[in-house]
A protein has these predicted regions:
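Condensing-enzyme catalytic core mediating Claisen C-C bond formation in acyl metabolism
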Residues: 4-8, 31, 35-36, 218-294, ...
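A glycine- and small-aliphatic-rich helix-loop capping segment at beta-alpha/alpha-beta transitions
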Residues: 21-28, 112-129, 179-182, 202-215, ...
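Active-site-proximal alpha-helical scaffold in enzymes
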Residues: 77-90, 142-145, 150-153, 159-194, ...
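Phosphate/pyrophosphate-binding loops at sites that engage ATP/ADP/AMP, CoA/4′-phosphopantetheine
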Residues: 84-99, 250-257, 286-303, 326-330
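Short glycine/threonine-rich loop-to-helix capping motif typified by GTGT followed
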Residues: 271-280, 309-326, 346-353, 383-386
């Protein structure tokens, strides 16, 4: 019998809400978490807004003496993971050893500890070696993030970080699904976390010309997916974590099942370091592969959570890809929305963010809206649920992601509630 994978716990640290209840209220009502940057002085640069997590106490999750040795992404991930385990009804450190050996940690992150590493270089080049962390190398490598979570929760299963750009957390959840399907693990702490709001990263994106520079005085209007006047994305941050569990295992312990992860597809266009190919064929094929594994057709898709970055190229081609994947007639019938309009772009964590929003949409039978879609683009002509959410029962949903380097990944969620 095929082993099925279900989500039994969820935790959130988001620019528009810390904790799942706060995130649910904000995302379903359409409240923006984009604000002026407070992490550093942005007054001298062209972009001064970000989807920044506010009212978050890092020292509630990392001791004061340890804070200089870790990145901001770690307290995000610890907070979201703790909530995910709690809502799943799991006291991880109290589990028997054999169960902890079958409990893995697989997290996606695009930048990991990049802001920590940037600070270490700043200290080094300013001759402040005494202020540098003794752990500048181990903390700075990508793989440290999953290890920190494994140590905190005493989980002895596979501990991996997946980093594939913006598809990182989608791919991490798929890898976790494969580990459970194959029988190697019974449950996995999985999802995504990123904290890329630093001067160096923001300046790098400015050099690429892919951030919006028009909305410093009205931050909440800056992320404008599918609107004709969109001119770039807004950097975001946060963590969205889940407990992924084998279905029979979850049933046996009486767990509440939030959704089934039933399909995954991933492709690469092999085209360009940053740009998408205009045809949209490979993003469409990734969606098709996910639907194929889930055993569903276009007529079964009730909602699509879009990548929707607010760049001219991405939004146009993602629209084209959905028409190819679902057929143009069906694509026009299926409601879709872009969470990045509310929170900005949290890089490798964005797939997990979209999955969290989709689960909440299933639970509440309420679609999250796409904000700031003020000017219709004739090349982006699908139903993006503009301005306000709407009631909708969701049986199956597609969660789509597109990354630098021509990567495309999609997951299908099934509502078992």
């Amino acid at each position: 019998m095929k082993r099925r994978c279900v989500i039994t716990g969820m935790g959130v640290v988001s620019p528009n809400g810390v904790g799942t209840p706060a995130f649910a209220d904000a995302s379903l009502e359409g409240r923006s978490g984009v604000r002026r940057i407070s992490r550093f002085d942005s007054s001298a640069i062209e972009v001064q807004i970000a989807g920044e997590v506010s009212d978050f106490d890092e020292l509630a999750w990392v001791e004061k003496k340890e804070r200089k040795h870790v990145s901001r992404v770690l307290p995000f991930a610890l907070c979201a993971s703790s909530e995910a385990l709690e809502t799943a009804g799991i006291q991880a450190t109290s589990l028997p050893l054999e169960e902890r050996r079958r409990f893995g940690v697989i997290i996606g992150s695009g930048g990991g500890s990049s802001e920590f590493t940037e600070e270490q270089y700043r200290l080094y080049f300013h001759g402040q070696l005494s202020k540098m962390s003794l752990f500048c190398v181990p903390t700075g490598v990508m793989g440290s993030l999953s290890s920190e979570l494994s140590v905190r929760f005493s989980l002895r299963g596979a501990s991996h970080v997946i980093t594939s750009g913006c598809t990182s957390s989608t791919d991490a959840m798929a890898y976790a699904m494969r580990q459970i399907e194959s029988g190697r693990l019974d449950w996995v702490l999985t999802g995504g976390a990123d904290a890329p709001i630093s001067l160096g990263t923001v300046k790098g994106f400015i050099l690429m010309g892919i951030l919006t520079e028009k909305w410093n005085q009205a931050p909440e209007k800056g992320s404008r997916p599918f609107s004709k006047d969109r001119d770039g994305f807004v950097v975001g941050e946060g963590a969205w974590m889940f407990v992924l569990e084998e279905y029979e295992h979850a049933k046996a312990r009486g767990a509440t099942i939030l959704a089934e992860v039933c399909g995954y597809g991933s492709t690469c266009e092999a085209y360009h370091r940053v740009k998408l190919k205009e045809c949209g064929e490979e993003p469409a094929r990734a969606i098709g592969l996910a639907m194929q594994q889930a055993g569903i057709g276009p007529e079964d898709v009730d909602y699509v959570n879009l990548h929707g970055t607010s760049t001219q190229l991405n939004d146009r081609i993602e629209t084209r890809a959905l028409k190819l994947a679902l057929g143009e007639e069906r694509a026009r019938q299926v409601p879709m929305s872009a969470l990045k309009s509310q929170i900005g772009h949290p890089q490798g964590a964005c797939g997990a963010a979209g999955i969290a929003a989709t689960i909440l949409a299933m639970q509440h039978q309420q679609l999250p809206p796409t904000l700031n879609l003020d000017n219709a683009d004739p090349e982006c002509d699908l139903d993006y649920v503009p301005a306000a959410g709407r009631k909708k029962t969701i049986g199956h949903a597609v969660c789509n992601c597109i990354a630098f380097g021509s990567k495309n990944s999609a997951l299908v969620l099934r509502n078992l509630m």
